[in-house]
Amino acid sequence: MGQKINPIGLRIGVIKDWQSNWYADKNYTELVHEDIKIREYIENKLFNADVSAIQIDRAANRIKVTLHTAKPGMVIGKGGSGVEKLRSDIENLTGKKVHINVMEVKTPELDAHLAAKSIAIALERRVAFRRAMKQAVGRAMRQGAKGIKVMCSGRLGGAEMSRTEWYTEGNVPLQTLRADIDYGMVEANTAYGQIGVKCWINKGEVLPEVDENEETKEENKEKSEEKSE
């Protein structure tokens, strides 16, 4: 299943967290649709700001939106005018109080969504697909990725028959739950039709935190067993 399922969804509750954090007993479907509208609005409005993730938290009638972006200056705007305009637009869209946080993505080369987006933009500019894939893989590996896998699917190079091409470097263990695998999927709109771009980036293993009290208990247990022997 690790080869087919979304690797972020597979790791939720293990090393990944939900991108929408809230609970609703009633009006659940309305809130889900509201989340979708917020995400679509932000993605369309801030397309050039390289937004990699949108996290939504709710409490009562307040919404907290956290934007992870490689270009925070473009989101915030001059004197905060950009983020203020965005906040008022989302408030008009939802009819609720909105607070916006902007988080900078320090290494966009290691963000799977932004890597896939860079390949998609290159394909739309008629760059050869192998060259676009190879450049994205090289950038990620230079920034310290343990492994990266890229897939392009569609009428590559304007061919009459669609096909799928892969480019892999390093190690990408999809079934290892402690492996921090980032995943992104973007569609490129070319003159020959849509090309799907998928990207998996392995950032290394995330080991569970060991509780110091539990660690000392284990040590004491081992010492007592040694004495009894």
UniProtKB/Swiss-Prot annotation:
Residues 38-106 form the KH type-2 domain. CDD domains: KH-II_30S_S3 (cd02412). The keyword RNA-binding applies. GO terms for cellular component: cytosolic small ribosomal subunit. Residues 208-217 have a biased composition (Acidic residues). Residues 208-229 are annotated as: Disordered. Pfam families: KH_2 (PF07650), Ribosomal_S3_C (PF00189). Belongs to the universal ribosomal protein uS3 family. HAMAP family: Ribosomal_uS3_B. PANTHER family: 30S/40S RIBOSOMAL PROTEIN S3 (PTHR11760), SMALL RIBOSOMAL SUBUNIT PROTEIN US3C (PTHR11760:SF19). This is Small ribosomal subunit protein uS3. It comes from Natranaerobius thermophilus (strain ATCC BAA-1301 / DSM 18059 / JW/NM-WN-LF).
